[in-house]
Structure formats: C-alpha cells, structure tokens
Amino acid sequence: MIIQCKDIKKTFKVGDTSVEILKGISLEINKGEFTAIIGESGSGKSTFLNILGGIMPCDEGEIVINEHHIEGLNENELALFRRENMGFIFQSYNLMPQLTALENVEMPLIFSGVSKKERIERAKSMLEKVGLADRMNHKPSELSGGQQQRVSIARALINNPSVILADEPTGNLDSKTTIEILDLLKDLNKNFNTTFVVVTHSQVVYEYADRVIKMEDGLLC
C-alpha cells in the first residue's frame, strides 16, 4: 500500500458561510496502480488531489504516503517530501515560458542539488522517453499543446517519484492528442511501476485505469 487516507475532511469559508468540500474521504491505493478519480466540477476531487500532494492542508484525517504521515509536516518538510516522492502534472502545463523544454525538465533537479552535467543527461533521457528528442531546445510557445504536456510529464518524472498526481492532464487537448498522452502515461506507469492518481472529467481515462473512483458532493461513491 503506497497511499492511505483516512477520514479526510476539508471546509472552506465563503463569506460568513462554511462550505464542507470533503466530508470524510477514506482511500487506499496500491503501489503501481493507475487510479482515476472522476466527478463533476465542485465534487471535491481537485481539492482532494491538492491535499494528497501536500499543497493544501486537510482539516481532519490522516494521510500516509510511502510510509510517511504528511498531514503533520511543516512547509519545509512538505517541500522536501514532495521533491523526493511526488511528481505533478497539470491541465495548464505550468511550464516556464522563457526556458526551453530541456531547461524546464531540468528545473526540479536544480533544487535537488544535482550537478549541471547530470541534470542535462537525465533531462535529455527523460525527454527521449516521452518522444521529444527533437524538440529539446524549443520553448513552450514553439510547441503544440500535446508537446507541452509531454514536457510537463517528463518534468514530473525527472526525480523518479513514487507517485504522480495528475489534475485533468488531457483537459486542454483534442481527442487524438488525449489518446496519445494517455497511452504515454500508461506506458510510463507500467515501465516505471509509478503510482498514478488522475483526476479527470474524461471518460476515455476509464480504459486506462486499473480502478475508477467516483467522487460526488465530497464523498467517494
């Protein structure tokens, strides 16, 4: 078991009103599993993913990832934990526009203290794995949406994380590119035995997931 969540709750204040977004989520995910979490906008799935990634604290509950209780970690401890254990893929790619594909993929290794030579070698190797060997020196504005997402995927995997959290990774892509990206994610899932947790609206993801979990009104169905 690589992820264990027990009774996760989260409430937001909207003016004078408290809105309960997560109402007690309990979930276990095995190592190497490709899990899809589906649900309508406002169901709480992105909030849950942010809590899993240590980006947002929960109000109540326990989260164990890779045998680490993360709900009690401070900001510095969380940053170190994310760097060593997790990778993130976003709908909007979140690439640095002034950097090349190679430099974007290198970035997490800088924070890990990896030498320049090793950073370049590892970033090149990862870009080759995602099919961008010939686009390494292009900036995001010179790449298609699918190519930018491939750069984002390479960056997410560069530190060899145990867990990848993906928030609507195909949300900005056309149907053909969506299939290409999902094929890539599943291949990486199998080849690296990396655990994937994918939040999505897309029913296409069902075909790739080992398990599909529906979230509705802050609860798992």
Model-inferred region functions:
Residues 217-221:
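Conserved switch/coupling elements of ABC/ABC-like ATPase nucleotide-binding domains
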